[in-house]
Amino acid sequence: EALEKLSKQTIEGVILDVRNNPGGLLNTAIDISSMFIKTGKIVSLRYYDGTKEIIPSIPGYYNNFLENIPIVLLVNTASASASEILAGALKDNEVATLIGETTYGKAAVQRPFQLSTGGEIWLPIARYFTPNGTDINLKGIAPHIEVKNPPKEVVSLTLTSISEEEAQQALYTTTDKPILHIEEDLQLKTALDFIVSGGK
């Protein structure tokens, strides 16, 4: 919905923020990655029973308006699991620039198993690798541009304080006056500067 709204506007670039994102569903990571990757691999899975699976971009999900604009993905040491699938897919397919810190390094794919008591337990069933075959487990994904992570409270405050209009204002401002907390959030500021410079 957000990308559809953006497609009707003239934009300079896109910034995705998965800092402090512990992950989520594998299918969701694949869906989101496919919105930015026209063709190519998203992730490969190696199951503990010895089988392998290569998951490609889903046809029809790609947004054509993203083709010629810079895309930035903000990451930090708390970006894990499904958010790392997105990071690995965007990095290996060379469609986005990663800014921030090396990610957490959790490459386990888990699924729930029902217990006879009525509860459930989540157990790992596979390990995932990036499109280029990189094993990021306990290693993480290094950003293209490394920027020290600001305090978590600053990141949280920034995310809850900046509206869409204010973020756009940050892109086009010609003054040195800080806009909200952007100047304190070095990773976000670096991403904005990168977009303004045309992705250079």
Predicted features and spans:
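C-terminal "post-core" interaction segments
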Residues: 1-200
